[in-house]
Design a protein with these regions (language model features):
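Cytosolic-side transmembrane-helix boundaries in multi-pass membrane proteins
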Residues: 1-31, 44, 238, 245-252, ...
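Membrane-interfacial amphipathic/re-entrant helices at transmembrane-helix boundaries
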Residues: 2-3, 10-80
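Short loop segments and helix-boundary regions at transmembrane helix junctions
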Residues: 17-25, 89-97, 121-188, 226, ...
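Single transmembrane alpha-helix segments in multi-pass membrane proteins
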Residues: 42-46, 56-116, 134, 138-153, ...
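Short, non-helical or kinked segments that cap or interrupt transmembrane helices
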Residues: 47-52, 89-106, 149-158, 232, ...
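Transmembrane helix-bundle core of multi-pass membrane transporters
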Residues: 65, 155-226, 279, 333, ...
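Helix-loop-helix "hairpin" substructures at the membrane interface of multi-pass membrane proteins
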Residues: 202-279, 303-304
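Transmembrane alpha-helical segments in multi-pass inner-membrane proteins
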Residues: 259-265, 271-339
Length: 367
């Protein structure tokens, strides 16, 4: 007798849009499960009470005034990169080159500090740094955008490859500008004169990045939701054919949007070199160009929601680092914990978008 195909036990069905409080509840549950698993793993590994683990997570982010400021500064940097990527992502231009665009902006800022530091007044040097960083980041975004607009090249590959070029450029100039010679690093730039160092706000070196992040968040929200350019980005993202039909010049939108995206990444490079580290290295972006992709995607390209996503990721990352330090574990262990947390955060998005529909009753097998 011919066998009848059995129905699957469940189907994956796309949900209607969930209310915000249900989405928030699913994310909260995912974080809770991630924390429980991190606590269990750490307890098994070290024999330490899980409550001490959770206490370390909080103390890692907010254990002192300095740690609190550093946490918010890191949130601001991650948020700025995510905001820079969002216009391109909303247009379905997959810009994976934020890391390189940040490095390009940082390298341009460092070049101004080193080459102009003893030739021009401080205010003029800072102005040159701002222009150079924005221009360098914009150029780094323009190149893959131009090839995409003209020849429809794969933007994921081209933006990714631009990261390697930027990294090697920074590595090259690190040797050219190294101090002292043979050290393999530039060191603190203009440490004696502070020329090119971005000004502090109310005497705090942390506030500038935070203020810039607040301003750019508001700007990006208005730009994407209430401007003609933001509307064009949305239409191109939905359908290029529709955009062309209604008279939108798709190539122009692609290039303009990537110029903006790259320039904002260049601004982050300026803040890192001129305001935070006062030097440039190949690792100055700290991989946040890739983490920002997750922040933007998790937030459904909503600039306001990105504030909370950035806070969550930085809070967990700083907490994981504190665990590895307090309990005598190496930094790789904190990376493991951060990976577990990010895995749960990403996984919960599946349950926000889809649901499992189980079969009501099993089919009787025919003999």
């Amino acid at each position: 007798m011919k066998e009848k195909n059995k129905e699957p036990l469940f189907h994956i069905v796309k949900r209607d849009a969930l209310p915000w409080y249900k989405s928030l509840g699913i994310r909260f549950l995912a974080i809770l499960l991630a924390l429980i698993l991190c606590g269990i793993i750490t307890t098994i590994t070290t024999g330490i009470n899980p409550l001490q683990v959770y206490q370390s997570i909080v103390l890692g982010a907010f254990g002192s005034v300095r740690k609190t400021w550093v946490t918010f500064q890191n949130i601001a940097i991650l948020l700025l990169i995510a905001l820079a990527l969002t216009p391109a992502f909303k247009m379905k231009f997959w810009n994976i080159g934020a890391e390189g665009q940040v490095l390009a902006g940082g390298l341009a800022a460092a070049a101004c500090m080193i080459c102009l530091g003893d030739k021009l007044p401080n205010a003029v040097v800072i102005l040159c740094m701002i222009v150079a960083s924005l221009a360098a980041g914009a150029i780094w975004g323009f190149i893959p955008a131009f090839f995409k607009a003209k020849w429809n090249t794969n933007e994921t590959l081209s933006t990714l490859m631009m990261n390697y070029i930027a990294t090697q450029l920074v590595a090259f100039y690190t040797i050219v500008w190294e101090v002292p010679k043979g050290s393999g690093k530039i060191g603190i730039i203009n440490q004696n004169t502070n020329v090119g160092w971005l000004p502090q706000i109310f005497g705090s070196k942390y506030l500038l990045s935070i203020v810039v992040a607040v301003v750019i968040t508001i700007f990006m929200y208005v730009y994407l939701n209430y401007s003609k350019q933001g509307y064009e980005i949305s239409v191109v993202g939905e359908s290029e054919n529709t955009a062309k039909y209604v008279g939108i010049k798709v190539e122009k939108v692609i290039i303009r949007t990537m110029l903006l995206s790259g320039a904002l990444c260049g601004l982050v490079g300026l803040l890192l070199v001129g305001g935070i580290n006062h030097t440039v290295t190949t690792t100055i972006a700290g991989g946040q160009g890739f983490t920002a992709v997750l922040v933007s995607w998790m937030s459904k390209f909503n600039p306001l929601t990105m504030v909370f996503s950035s806070f969550l990721i930085i809070f967990m990352d700083r907490g994981a680092s504190e665990i590895s330090t307090n309990f005598g574990l190496n930094h790789s262990y904190s990376d493991i914990l951060t990976g577990i947390i990010l895995f749960f955060i990403i996984g919960c998005e599946f349950f926000i978008t889809y649901r499992l529909q189980f079969r009501k009753k099993a089919e009787k097998e025919e003999q």
